A protein has these predicted regions:
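P-loop/Walker-type NTP enzyme "switch/lid" segment
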Residues: 1-71, 169-174
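Conserved catalytic-core segment of NTP-binding enzymes
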Residues: 60, 64, 68-71, 75, ...
Length: 175
């Protein structure tokens, strides 16, 4: 749904043959489109289509894809597009729970709060928080919100904190 980049981040971009759209159109089976990560047993990626149309997969189709994958996998993670447009609504349609990922910046936390409200309005009860790109030195200097600040504002359980790491940026850019 939306832009495709997880294949790049996982180093699987050269293995994409089919996408979720081909599964839905019947051009291929789910097993043909899933890319199994050889380094992580049990991890597979169903790539999104490489197009700009956030509405290319509707909520019923998302539900269908998740139903298919539920037969093989215990956990299915859906990387939602940023924002609160139709792509987001379509992506959350089959969700039982959600992990809201935000950076500790005022604008991002405000957006996360809005997303939490939308998740609750869509009857997703189990919502947790993952804080990404935390810079401890900036927090100490009062130039970035602390984990406690973000937790207090969003008032959902924290599942983890990922510190900023330049190595991740380098790795992502190199593939």
């Amino acid at each position: 749904i939306g832009l495709r980049n997880l294949d790049l981040l996982l180093g699987l971009e050269n293995r994409v043959i089919y996408t979720a759209l081909e599964v839905l159109s019947g051009e291929c089976r789910l097993e043909q489109a899933l890319i199994k990560d050889k380094r992580q047993p049990g991890l597979a990626l169903l790539p999104a289509a490489q197009n700009r149309n956030k509405d290319s997969i509707n909520s019923d189709q998302m539900q269908y894809l998740v139903t298919l994958m539920n037969q093989q996998y215990d956990y299915i993670l859906i990387d939602c597009p940023a924002g609160i447009e139709s792509g987001f609504h379509n992506a959350i349609a089959p969700a039982d729970e959600a992990i809201v990922v935000t950076t500790p910046e005022i604008a991002a936390v405000r957006d996360a709060d809005r997303v939490i409200g939308l998740l609750e309005a869509n009857n997703i009860k189990r919502i947790s928080l993952l804080i990404n790109r935390l810079r401890p030195q900036m927090v100490k200097a009062n130039d970035m919100m602390s984990v406690a600040d973000v937790k207090e504002i969003l008032a959902i359980p924290l599942v983890g904190v990922i510190p900023e790491d330049e190595c991740v940026i380098v790795s992502t850019n190199r593939g």
